[in-house]
Amino acid sequence: MKALPFPCRPAQDRVLEALPQMGGILSGNDALRGAIADGLMLKDPGAAYYAYECSGEPGRVTGVVAICPINVLTGSDEAAAENVDALAAARAIAELKVQPRPVSLAYEASPVMDIILGAAKEGASLYAVTDPAGITHRVWEVKREDAVAAIRAMLDQAPEPALADDPAYATALTGASQLLADEARAAGTYTGKEPFNFTVAALFPAAQVAGAAPQVPTGLLTHQIARF
């Protein structure tokens, strides 16, 4: 499985201000650009993985957030592909040019990965927010070169992950990717390396999630899929 580090997130000291506004910030490209200009949302200059912990009922689970090729979502629910809401969501994501939250995937984690993420969690968290349901979401940035290399090596050895999210959301992401790819091909600029060919994913150990995995809050970790 190929999973790369990535940048894009709210300003650390303004996350509690940003999250309640995500409905407006992610309502359109102009609103998002305004939030970036205001310093509410950041585009990190460097690339990093993120350790993500969700704690509450029924327990605690830790995943790693990374960029994966969009084809990891291939084979999502065919019925969802015909869903009118999913098609509308795909168009909205393509117009916004940003993936609003990571898609949740389940993968075969290794004990070494547990050690790496455990070490990352010993430091101060980048974010720690509790939602109205009482679920606490914590995020740690992993950007030390040796840690990034170790995580990348572990993920390179892992089998392809399985979808552990709403099939309609996965379909919307693949649909947005296809719409933007079609536009690039029509313009004669398609290379295959564009950011819309990748998706930001929260990868959770399959042994810790049954069926649906936790969802990272909308706007907490996003992915710009095309130029504004």
Residue ranges and their predicted role:
Residues 1-161, 166-228:
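Surface-exposed, charge/polar-rich loops and edge strands
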